Amino acid sequence: VVCSIICAPVFASDYSTGADDIQRCTRYGRKRLGKSRLLAAMTLSTVLYVVCAGVFVALTLAVFGDDKTSAQLALDALVLGNITMNGVLILTLAAGLLSVFAMTAFTLWLSARMRSGVAVLAVTLAVAMTPTFLIVLLRESAVGDWLRLLLPSGGLGLGTGMFVDIQVGKFLTIGSLAIWTPFVMLAAPVIEAPVFALLAQRAYVRREDAALPRKRPRH
């Protein structure tokens, strides 16, 4: 949520104030500026997540100790996987980081396409909260699980996320293929983050191209 609040006005605020008209006139006001903003936003989101994750891990180790977190998670669905609590913690942190990347890129794409930072933030918060609503409204539905896991915020919902899905041990099917839900949660943001980042860059450059005055051909 904090990353979305920070990234929502990255492009949209300049559209609404007209500052982008000035930036387009600069030497590096197009592709390089767009790439720099994308990189800065992704870096800031990464730093914020690492800090929060570090605090979470420190509190977890302080409360439960290393012996507790290294014990094997002996659930029926995970016996064959031989996953320890340390492994669960690593997977949870990895899924969270990937989802932060995907949500940041998604927010930047919306910001590059919309003029209102408030509208961008509203859409982003709705997407961020959707997995929580889906887990409540469509708990036993495979369609609900697919939607929840394929959203950029699939690994960040309240009451959902990697830690919960590992314990539940659900599988989603595509024909005769059964896929463990944590695998979907890890794979989806890996694809979505670069796609939305490229779309954001493309939307920003195309918006600038559309705003530039066209030269009339000389007869």
What do the predicted segments below correspond to?
Residues 30, 116-117:
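Membrane-helix interface/capping residues of multi-pass secondary transporters
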Residues 1-14, 35-113, 157-180:
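Secretory targeting signals
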Residues 18-19, 105, 121:
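Transmembrane alpha-helix boundary/hinge residues in polytopic small-molecule transporters
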Residues 66-87, 118-122, 127-216:
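Terminal transmembrane helical anchor/hairpin motif
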Residues 26, 113-114:
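Transmembrane helix irregularities
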Residues 7-22, 26, 30:
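Transmembrane helix boundary and interhelical loop/hinge segments in multi-pass membrane proteins
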Residues 26-28, 37, 202-203:
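Short, flexible loop/turn elements at secondary-structure junctions
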